[in-house]
Amino acid sequence: METDIVVIGAGPVGIFTAFQAGMLDMRCHIIDVLDQAGGQCTALYPEKPIYDIPGYPVITAQKLIEQLMEQASPFEPVYHLSQRVEEIANNDSQSFIVVTSAGTKVKCKAIIIAAGNGIFEPNRPPLSGILEYENKSVFYNVNKISDFQDKIIVIAGGGDSAADWTVELSKVAKKIYVIHRRKEFRCVSETRNKLKLLESSGRIELVVPYQLHKLTGNDGQLSAVIIKNITSKEEKKISADFLLPFFGLSMDLGPIGSWDIQLERSRVVVDQATLRTSRDRIYAIGDVAAYLGKLKLILNGFAESTMACYDIYKVIHNSPVNFQYSTSKVVRGKKSDLL
């Protein structure tokens, strides 16, 4: 297989890259280790609302991915899912051979690393027998809010994810218990105020300072969560249908460290103006990219994608881009109608 650009990572920024490259008449193959496109947006919080995407006062993560894929579809990007990039070999001075864990080989003229935070796994609480309950009544992400309709939920954690999902699930749950080691929650003040209002209304109960201690149930279905007070060691038993532990994610850049590119604190160092890495024709965008003043926002990743694609065009064609506004770029026929 042969293409212009291989994009490593099928998160929102990686998918948008296929659109932006297509606008410059460059083809893309997108490779991702997950079994569906969307990165963390679909794997961890598909129904979580996002508020900082231009033109959308609010949009769920899943809907954003669907819209981005539809936007890119006229340019027919090729997705290689459930595959991890294992090797990047120089074919010659102007191309690479990218090899995946499935044995797929793609020849390309440039590579864009849009790997987000790398390969991620949720931090599992050290509870005996928790594996028996995982994906049955213990979950580390929420795929369908409706699954929690009229259920009793224990949410553990004190960061943004725990607080945000408490607010969202309180709209459908029968009762939510929020377990945290400290009295203060590490979330934005607006969300903290919402938690206080929900607690005063009786919709949720903030149980602090406590930590998870034991699980009880049968055949993977929870019946109760036992918690322990941090200071007094007192134990409490909370009847529950579901446990949602939100203790963050452990990140691993995987094989990126062996690709002969400069790294800094598990991030890929790039030139801010072009998003070039230390290796010719390899670029990095989105959360994985590092430069002075970097903002880890989806919006910023979209801008980086655009800058990288424009620079790749100049490198591949040895000439500047004949700039066109998208309003004057007509895409018809086989590539569908964007207008």
UniProtKB/Swiss-Prot annotation:
Keyword NADP found: yes
Pfam families in the cross-refs: Pyr_redox_2 (PF07992)
UniProt entry keywords in alphabetical sequence: FAD, Flavoprotein, NADP, Oxidoreductase
Cofactor: how and how many bound: Binds 1 FAD per subunit.
GO molecular function terms noted in the UniProt entry: ferredoxin-NADP+ reductase activity; flavin adenine dinucleotide binding; NADP binding
Gene3D superfamilies, A to Z: FAD/NAD(P)-binding domain
Domain of life: Bacteria
Essential cofactor(s): FAD
InterPro entries, A to Z: FAD/NAD-bd_sf, FAD/NAD-binding_dom, Fd--NADP_Rdtase_type_2, Ferredoxin-NADP_redctase_2
EC numbers, comma separated: 1.18.1.2
Residues that, per the record, bind FAD: 32, 40, 45, 85, 120, 287, 327
Catalysis performed (reactions): 2 reduced [2Fe-2S]-[ferredoxin] + NADP(+) + H(+) = 2 oxidized [2Fe-2S]-[ferredoxin] + NADPH
Protein family membership: Belongs to the ferredoxin--NADP reductase type 2 family.
Database matches in PANTHER family: THIOREDOXIN REDUCTASE 1-RELATED-RELATED
Self-association state and partner proteins as the record states: Homodimer.
Stated name of the protein: Ferredoxin--NADP reductase
Protein species of origin: Wolbachia sp. subsp. Brugia malayi (strain TRS)
